[in-house]
């Protein structure tokens, strides 16, 4: 079946059925053994709010403008495309599972405050292609605009102060600002200034989320940008990328300062999710116990040529991608995004008490 020819109404109907499927499927919801009483955050969150890009997006980005709604995305879970840029789950799903809540509803479906039960679990505002500033993906809201949407819900009393006090926010702006800079032929000399500008905006954004009442904010550090399949050279990947190092260094220092300004700075309001060290550990693993091993960690399961994406087809319907036989043996799903098994490995490293 050529899914690109399906009508929007048919796809909408599929999504409604999918939402019911996810509600009853145990693999996306927490088990009693995985529920954390205190755990990573020091308290038991009951809600998760998510802001960011395609590493966290669970279906906000419109299916008319991105290939994440096309086969083979979603083949591992739940079996059909859900708008995730992966064969299955993404970072948001695994974080929600660790916390002990169901994956939060996307803003696209929950922005009207309904269904109430689903909205009460939190909400995902992340869009694929988003950045700290406007990126080359013109129709995608920046992180600041995503927070605007969150604030509008608060003004409508969709969430109470008590709701927010039992919540965690996940902020994942990884690299679209830098990708846009490269596409526009930005100079290497100007990259440092851009990095400082991006990090400054991220710090403003996460502080704003905290000021709106969210109890804690988890901020993703950037993984090694030059290790993406689309950028890896025959010599391998550059894990000592100075640009990524500067981004993470400035972000860490900025978050420390924000924590120091908190009234109760023993209860750290701003935390980091160290994707950089998790990725590097997995890339360099040669069989260390407890760390997943991938035969070729820099190779994409859904491989494409320059200018095409996983799920793309020609006008005649010919596939413009090559699909691997076993997605579980690949860390990367496509040239940029992580596979379900890849994300499982990352969170197993970062949250060692978890059972994914």
From Swiss-Prot:
The subcellular localization recorded is: Secreted
Q: Which GO terms describe its biological process?
A: lipid catabolic process
- Name of the protein in its database record: GDSL esterase/lipase At2g36325
- Which InterPro entries does the entry mention? GDSL (IPR001087), SGNH_hydro_sf (IPR036514), SGNH_plant_lipase-like (IPR035669)
> Which is an annotated GO molecular function term of this record?
hydrolase activity, acting on ester bonds
* CC terms in the record's Gene Ontology section: extracellular region; secretory vesicle
Which keywords does the record carry? Glycoprotein, Hydrolase, Lipid degradation, Lipid metabolism, Secreted, Signal
| Record-annotated active site | 54, 334, 337
Protein family (similarity comment): Belongs to the 'GDSL' lipolytic enzyme family.
The enzyme's E.C. designation: 3.1.1.-
Cross-referenced Gene3D superfamilies: SGNH hydrolase
User: Record's CDD domains?
Assistant: SGNH_plant_lipase_like
- Enzyme kind, highest EC tier: hydrolase
